[in-house]
Amino acid sequence: MSYVDEVLEIVQKKNADQPEFLQAVTEVLDSLRPCIEANEELYRKNAILERITEPDRQLMFRVPWVDDNGQVQVNRGFRVQFNNAIGPYKGGLRLHPSVNLGIIKFLGFEQVFKNSLTTLPIGGGKGGSDFDPKGKSDREIMAFCQSFMTELCKYIGADVDVPAGDIGTGAREIGFMFGQFKRIRGSYEGVLTGKGLTYGGSLARTEATGYGLLYLTNALLKDHDIDIAGKTCAVSGAGNVAIYAIQKAHQLGAKCVTCSDSTGWIYDPEGIDVALLKEVKEVKRARLDAYAAARPSAEYHVKKDANDHGVWSIKCALALPCATQNELNLDDAKMLVANGVISVTEGANMPTTLEATKYLQENGVLFVGGKAANAGGVATSALEMSQNSERLSWTFEEVDGKLKGIMETIYANISDAAKRYNMTVGGNADYVAGANIAGFEKVVDAMLAQGVC
C-alpha cells in the first residue's frame, strides 16, 4: 500500500463522522501523489502526511448569550488551529447553523494550502459557531460576539492566530469582537482582519477577492495568448466577490452579462451595471428583481429550485462562479462546454462539483480552483496584518498593486508546479493539482526545517 493510501486509511478511521473533512483530505492527497511519491522515503520517515492532516489543536467551547426577550441562548464555538509552520494561524470565523467541527476542520485544512499560495507568512486555521445571525437584532449580535470572543481571546493574538470574517461575519461582527478582545486583554493589536478603516482596517479589502480573481484570470489567459478584452463573462452571485469581479472585468475590457442571488438571476446583454447592482444589493439590500425593474435591458429569471443555475446557460467565454458550494454541476459544465467556454476560475469556495471539474478539464477548458483563484481575500488580510504591525495605512493603489503582484505570482507558481510534475489534463496544465502541490511544498519545507513539532 502506498504512503498516501496508508494515511488516507488512518484519517478515515479517525474522522469517520466528518465527511467534509474526509473529502477535502482525499482530494488534496490524491492530487499530491506525484509529489509525495518523489519524496516518499523522506516524508514517511518524518510522518509528514500524518502531521499535516492532524490539526495542531481543536478548540470547542460553549457560547452563552441573552436574547432580546431575556432568554439565555447557548451556541457552540469552534477554532481549529491547523498548521503554523509558515506563520500565525489565519482563517475566517463562520457564523451559520450548519457549522460543526468537521466543516471547520475541512475549511482549516484547505486554508493551510491557500495561505501558503499567497507567498505571505501565514499559517492556516478556521473557526466559527452554529449561531445564525439572520433575523437577530444588533444588540443580540453584539451579545453573541462578546460572549464568543470572551472565550476565543485566550487562544489568539497578532503573532499567534489572526481570525477574519467569513459567512455571517462581516464588519459589524468583527467590530464587536475586536472591542471585546481589547476590553478583556487590554491590548490594541492586529488580532482580527476585516476591521473598519477607522481602527486598523485596510483599503481594498472589500474589493480584494473579486479583483484578485480577475487578476489571476487575466494572467491565465495571457499565458495562453488570449486577450480578455471583448470577452463575455457569466458570473454567479451578487455579493462582494461577484460585484467586484464584475467591476474589475469591465475595467479590463470584458463584459459580464449575468449575476444571481438565492431567488433568481439576471441576464443583461448590455453588461451588468455595477453602480445599479451595488445600489440594489448594498444600499437597498433588495433582491435582483429590483435590478431588472430599473434596467430595461435586463431579464430577471426566478429560480425554479435550488438546482436552477441558469446563469451557466448563457453563452460566454469566461465563467466566474462566485456564489456558493456546488453551484456548478455536471449539467451546467456540459452547457458551458457546448457554448464554447474558454476558462472557469472560481471566486467562491468549491463552487464546482468534482464531476463538473473533471468534465471541464477533460474538454480543454482552462480551470483554476478557488484555492488559488480566490486567494486575493486572504492575501489582502495578510497585507492588513502587515500594516497593523508597522502602524501604517497604505493607499488603495498600494494595496491593489501588491494584490495584483501576488495573484500573478500565484498563477506562475501553480503553473510551474503542474509542469514540474507533468500534471496535465485535457491538453492543459492541471492547475488544481498545481495549486495543491505549490502550497504543500512550501509548508512541508518549513515543517522539515523546524523538526518534529
Q: Where are the regions that the model predicts?
A:
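Structured beta-strand/loop patches that form or line metal/cofactor-binding pockets in enzymes
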Residues: 42-71
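Conserved active-site and cofactor/substrate-binding residues in soluble primary-metabolism enzymes
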Residues: 2, 16, 20-23, 27, ...
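Glycine/serine-rich phosphate-binding loop and adjoining beta1-alpha1 elements at the start
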Residues: 96, 115-229
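Rossmann-like adenosine-cofactor binding region
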Residues: 264-367, 372
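N-terminal cap/recognition module
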Residues: 71-112
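Adenosine-phosphate binding glycine-rich loop
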Residues: 2-24, 220, 322, 335-453
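Glycine-rich phosphate/diphosphate-binding loop of Rossmann-like nucleotide-binding domains
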Residues: 193-196, 201-315
